[in-house]
Swiss-Prot record:
CDD domains: KH-II_30S_S3. One of its GO terms (molecular function) is structural constituent of ribosome. Residues 238-266 have a biased composition (Low complexity). Pfam families: KH_2, Ribosomal_S3_C. The keyword Heme does not apply. This is Small ribosomal subunit protein uS3. GO terms for cellular component: cytosolic small ribosomal subunit; peptidoglycan-based cell wall; plasma membrane.
Length: 274
């Protein structure tokens, strides 16, 4: 099941959060339709901006839209003209006051949506699909927070008459593990032979207790204080028998005790047999 379903929806409420956050009673269908229209508006006019994610949050009379982009300068525009245009279009679409937040993506190579968009752009420019997939995998695996990646292309690959699907994978991508932090992205490439779908799964470690494993992982002995052996208080153990020095005949003699006559017999027998 984890191989087929969208990884983000599969983990909702467990390790992932909703991309649209609002509450509605009778306006539920209307709000869903508006959310779809907002995402289409932002994706259609800002292909070059590298939008990784769009989050929508609603109140009674306001709509907040957070745009996560790799190139915030394109979204903002010169002196904020592009951002003002986007805000005006969103207010015209929703009929409410819109708060627009533009957030920069720090590592575009580790974002599945941006990786899929990059591969799709190369396919549109007639780059060989295997070369584009391998290049994307190599650049993603250089990131410290990426543990595994899978890239899949589906369609008339290489202009073949029959469509097929091919994928490359490196590292671990546990799609069935619910605590795994899986980033998923989908993008379609428009070529002369038709559409080619590009899907990307990126594994970034396990989320345990609300924290990512990579961030929470620390050396085992870093927090635990190191125990020091007290000098001169503990008797030394002999390596062969595992007893203290006072437990042997030599120890008893050194301590002023007389060795039992029957205790020396097994020792001598052992030495003669050896």
């Amino acid at each position: 099941m984890g191989q087929k379903i969208n990884p983000h929806g599969f983990r909702l409420g467990i390790t992932t959060d909703w991309k649209s956050r609002w509450y509605a009673d009778k306006q539920y269908a209307e709000y869903v339709k508006e959310d779809v229209a907002i995402r289409r508006l932002l994706s259609s006019g800002l292909e070059r901006a590298g939008i990784a994610d769009v989050e929508i949050e609603r109140t009674r009379d306001r709509v907040r839209v957070d745009i996560h982009t790799a190139r915030p300068g394109i979204v903002i525009g010169r002196r904020g003209t592009e951002a003002d245009r986007i805000r005006a279009d969103l207010e015209k679409l929703t009929g409410k006051q819109v708060q627009l937040n533009i957030l920069e993506v720090k590592n575009p190579e580790s974002q599945a949506q941006l990786v899929a968009q990059g591969v799709a752009e190369q396919l549109s420019n007639r780059v060989a699909f295997r070369r584009a997939m391998r290049k994307a995998i190599q650049s993603a695996m250089r990131q410290p927070n990426v543990k595994g990646i899978r890239v899949q292309c589906s369609g008339r690959l290489g202009g073949a008459e029959m469509s097929r699907s091919e994928f490359y994978r490196e590292g671990r991508v546990p799609l069935h593990t619910l605590r795994a932090d899986i980033d998923y992205g989908l993008y379609e490439a428009k070529t002369t032979f038709g559409r080619i779908g590009v899907k990307v799964w990126i594994y970034k470690g396990d989320i345990v207790g609300g924290k990512r494993e990579l961030a929470a992982a620390a050396p085992a002995g870093a927090d635990r204080p190191r125990r020091e052996r007290p000098s001169g208080t503990r008797p030394r153990r002999s390596g062969a028998s595992g007893t203290t020095a006072t437990g042997t005949d030599a120890g008893r003699a050194a301590g002023g005790e007389e060795a039992a006559p029957d205790a020396a017999a097994p020792v001598e027998a052992q030495s003669t047999e050896s």
